């Protein structure tokens, strides 16, 4: 097997594979030739197909040394056309999925379907009110005699099977199906011993004894009524009921409303005052069915009819899920790096969330009189991120007297995923939002304690990668996270349709866990990466052509600069912006190095008419000065007169400060932001706008401090972020200026440029070289499969 140096791949490359060891071992020879830094190491394999695509692009295009930046972005090949077509098909599918979301898609719950099947005709006939539920049960028994999700969990299978057997027996239907179900329970009940308690379905210990009693009353034979484990479950139920104040269920909406069918004798009419606006009790079809059976309430009936409409005759475990499905869909699309394709749909979703938002937060479905920290945290974060006005003090509703945060009132054991979403929400903090500071400390410590024990406690979702996801999230705070780095990792963590959610039964959420999302994200990631690799070839040749090494610029530094640009603005069509970002960063360092180290003085007049007039105090530097001037000319080449005028102005301002010895990391950051904004079409008047000036000033201060932290190696991290009170306050102020809509003259995208640039400086200060090397290869060189 032949080793291939991708960074210097010839135009006619053959299908060969980079031979790489498991982690950090093979060296990139082009980078290794740098005299200033250690070689960059690889940690992944690059497929032959990926190499051939780069070669195909390169052969099809003009030679990279002669091609303009625009030429690079316009290259088309048969493979690229095919990928683009697949991407467009996937986008169309997802758009349709999102825009037809309605009350949210969710799989059928055999348990809830069985409870509804028990309802007798409300007009008094000896018939079921909902015969479709019985039909669904009859047609969905698994081969082993059980009912439940394909992901095996004995809690899910036992409860679903017991309920379905009782439902069929109550109408004396399908004795053969009943017999198979009874046999399954009898032969598998022992598996409850030692089963993972974290996978126990919600309310399991409350409803299993209830259905065992119903089975006894119906005369169902051979069920393991006297099995020690069944008796143990019954004892647990009695103990729980003793701990619940007798009248609590009638006083206020609590999680008890979720399992009313398992609570025994209740004053059912008293419960109606706690009914949600849609007629449900905590969005639970089975709990609502129990109330309907005892009250014949019309609103309960209407709710159940609605819940059955889109489930093929069965019922979901919760309905509606409009809030849950919308928030998590947006989150998944963003983290997978494909949200840009669905901006209209995302706004449509968030408008809906804003319209149903309550002062006490939200739950999985609208109008429930109940809220949880999971949905509320996700809502706070996404609404803030997209410029909606939302008060984070809503999270105080979940703060207990001892300072701890709880998923909801009455929660006995906290799970990892809600606290992780609280932590993520708390990182988008504006000045003065004390509740988010408290939430950050609590959630970080809560999750860190779980990680130290090497075991997460999770009751709501079964995900193979949740541990790794949370571990990474605590190591990589939002300020130090770049979009493409996040996508590269989340593609490893996201299971698509493989995620299983835990309610009264196991369930799936197509708008959240969807294989098409992942397929689209992989296609898009690899398409972007292929484009980035072509641009990286261009950057290497630019490095050699402009003799950047003579200015102290290492090849490693070049790669790092390009990586920061590509990991932030990654879209294939934004080649010019990426290259401008990377080259601006490099050129500013070249000029600073030339002026400060060699002692040379450069003189440029305001209008740049005298750009070619370079006066050198050292004759031997004339060659370098000429190279520097030519490189600067190349950077500005190709822009229209209006854009060129603005670029020269901001560069002139920056240059004067460098010559006066006032250059800094902050000034470099503002130069970069100004250059990117101008090339994006910024109106010259905006440069002097008060809001724009405030953004520039904050960015300067923040990035100057971050550069000092990086240069002086004084990094201290507390609760997942850099320990520097003033820096934290300034970052919060910048985030507020960027995210909060105030009707000002500065466009949101322009504001975001300052935050994006600042985050790259934060990234540089926060992550060590080894971590950055890994990120570089995940983003630029490791194809996703």
From Swiss-Prot:
Its EC number is 4.2.1.133. Belongs to the terpene synthase family. The Asp-Xaa-Asp-Asp (DXDD) motif is important for the catalytic activity, presumably through binding to Mg(2+). GO terms for biological process: diterpenoid biosynthetic process; gibberellin biosynthetic process. Substrate binds at residues 240, 459. Pathway: Secondary metabolite biosynthesis; terpenoid biosynthesis. GO terms for molecular function: copal-8-ol diphosphate synthase activity; magnesium ion binding; terpene synthase activity. Its cofactor is Mg(2+). It is an enzyme of class 4 (lyase). Its main location: plastid. Involved in the biosynthesis of labdane-type diterpenoid including sclareol, a diterpene-diol that is used as fragrance and flavoring, and has anticancer effects (able to kill leukemic and colon cancer cells by apoptosis). Sclareol can also be used as synthesis precursor of ambergris substitution fragance products such as ambrox. Terpene synthase that produces 8-hydroxycopalyl diphosphate from geranylgeranyl diphosphate (GGPP). This is Copal-8-ol diphosphate hydratase TPSSA3, chloroplastic. The keyword Cytoplasm does not apply. Mg(2+) binds at residues 372, 374. It catalyses: (2E,6E,10E)-geranylgeranyl diphosphate + H2O = 8-hydroxycopalyl diphosphate. The gene is LPS. Keywords: Chloroplast, Lyase, Magnesium, Metal-binding, Plastid, Transit peptide. It is found in: Plastid, Chloroplast. It comes from the Eukaryota. Disulfide bonds: none annotated. GO terms for cellular component: chloroplast. Escherichia coli expressing SsLPS and SsSCS from Salvia sclarea and CrtE from Pantoea agglomerans can produce sclareol in high-cell-density fermentation conditions, thus being an alternative, sustainable, and cost-efficient route to sclareol and other diterpene analogs. A motif (DXDD motif) lies at residues 372-375.
């Amino acid at each position: 097997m032949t080793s291939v140096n991708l960074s210097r791949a010839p135009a006619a490359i053959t299908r060969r594979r980079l031979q790489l060891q498991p982690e950090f071992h093979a060296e990139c020879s082009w980078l290794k030739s740098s005299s200033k830094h250690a070689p960059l190491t690889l940690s992944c394999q690059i497929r032959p197909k990926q190499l051939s695509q780069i070669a195909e692009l390169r052969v099809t295009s003009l030679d990279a040394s002669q091609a303009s930046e625009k030429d690079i972005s316009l290259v088309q090949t048969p493979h690229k056309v095919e990928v683009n077509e697949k991407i467009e098909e996937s986008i169309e599918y997802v758009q349709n999925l999102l825009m037809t979301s309605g009350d949210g898609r969710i799989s059928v719950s055999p348990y809830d379907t069985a409870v509804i099947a028990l309802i007798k005709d409300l007009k008094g006939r000896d018939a079921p009110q909902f015969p479709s539920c019985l039909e669904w049960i009859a047609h969905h028994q698994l081969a082993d005699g059980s009912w439940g999700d394909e992901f095996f969990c004995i809690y899910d299978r036992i409860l679903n099977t017991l309920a379905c057997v009782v439902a069929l027996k109550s109408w004396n239907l399908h004795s053969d199906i009943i017999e198979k179900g009874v046999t399954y329970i009898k032969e598998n009940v022992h598996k409850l011993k030692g089963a993972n308690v974290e996978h126990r379905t919600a309310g399991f210990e409350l409803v299993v004894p209830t259905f065992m009693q119903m089975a006894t009353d119906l005369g169902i034979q051979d069920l393991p009524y006297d099995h020690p484990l069944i008796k143990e479950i019954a004892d647990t139920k009695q103990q729980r009921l003793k701990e619940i104040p007798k009248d609590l269920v009638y006083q206020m909406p609590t999680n008890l409303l979720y399992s009313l069918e398992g609570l025994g004798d209740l004053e059912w009419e008293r419960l109606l005052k706690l009914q949600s606006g849609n007629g449900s009790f905590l969005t639970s079809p089975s709990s609502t069915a129990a109330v309907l059976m005892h009250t014949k309430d019309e609103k309960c009936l209407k709710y159940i009819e609605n819940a059955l409409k889109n489930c093929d005759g069965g019922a979901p475990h919760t309905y509606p899920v409009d809030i849950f499905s919308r928030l998590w869909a947006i989150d998944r699309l963003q983290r997978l790096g494909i949200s840009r394709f669905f901006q209209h749909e995302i706004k449509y979703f968030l408008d809906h969330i804003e319209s149903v938002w309550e002062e006490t937060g939200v739950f999985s479905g609208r109008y429930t009189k109940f809220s949880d920290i999971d949905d509320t945290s996700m809502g706070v974060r996404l609404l803030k991120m997209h410029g909606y006005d939302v008060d984070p003090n809503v999270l105080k509703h979940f703060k207990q007297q001892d300072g701890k945060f709880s998923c909801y009132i009455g929660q006995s054991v906290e799970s990892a995923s809600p606290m992780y979403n609280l932590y993520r929400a708390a990182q988008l903090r504006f000045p003065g939002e004390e509740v988010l500071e408290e939430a950050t400390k609590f959630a970080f410590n809560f999750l860190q304690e779980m990680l130290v024990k090497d075991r997460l406690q999770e009751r709501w979702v079964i995900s193979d990668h949740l541990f790794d996801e949370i571990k990474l999230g605590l190591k990589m705070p939002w300020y130090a996270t770049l979009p493409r780095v996040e996508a590269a990792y989340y593609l490893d963590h996201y299971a698509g349709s493989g995620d299983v959610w835990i309610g009264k039964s196991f369930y799936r959420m197509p708008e959240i866990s969807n294989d098409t999302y992942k397929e689209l994200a992989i296609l898009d990631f690899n398409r972007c990466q292929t484009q980035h690799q072509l641009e990286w070839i261009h950057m290497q040749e630019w490095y050699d052509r402009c003799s950047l090494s003579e200015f102290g610029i290492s090849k490693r530094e070049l790669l790092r600069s390009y990586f920061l640009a590509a990991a932030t603005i990654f879209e294939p069509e934004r080649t010019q912006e990426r290259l401008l970002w990377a080259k601006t960063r490099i050129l500013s360092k070249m000029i600073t190095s030339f002026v400060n180290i060699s002692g040379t003085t450069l003189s440029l007049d305001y209008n740049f008419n005298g750009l070619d007039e370079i006066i050198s105090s050292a004759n031997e530097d004339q060659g370098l000065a000429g190279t520097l001037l030519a490189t600067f000319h190349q950077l500005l080449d190709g822009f229209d007169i209006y854009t060129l005028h603005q670029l020269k102005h901001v560069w002139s301002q920056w240059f004067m400060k460098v010559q006066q010895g006032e250059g800094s990391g902050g000034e470099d950051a503002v130069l970069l932001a100004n250059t990117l904004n101008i090339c994006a079409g910024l109106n010259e008047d905006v440069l002097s706008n008060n809001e724009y000036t405030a953004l520039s000033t904050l960015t300067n201060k923040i990035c100057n401090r971050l550069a000092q932290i990086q240069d002086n190696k004084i990094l201290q991290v507390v609760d997942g972020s850099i320990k520097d009170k003033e820096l934290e306050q300034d970052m919060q102020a910048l985030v507020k200026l960027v995210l909060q809509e105030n009707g000002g003259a500065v466009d949101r995208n322009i504001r975001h440029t300052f935050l994006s640039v600042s985050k790259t400086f934060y990234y540089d200060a926060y992550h060590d070289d080894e971590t950055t090397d890994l990120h570089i290869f995940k983003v630029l060189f490791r194809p996703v499969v």
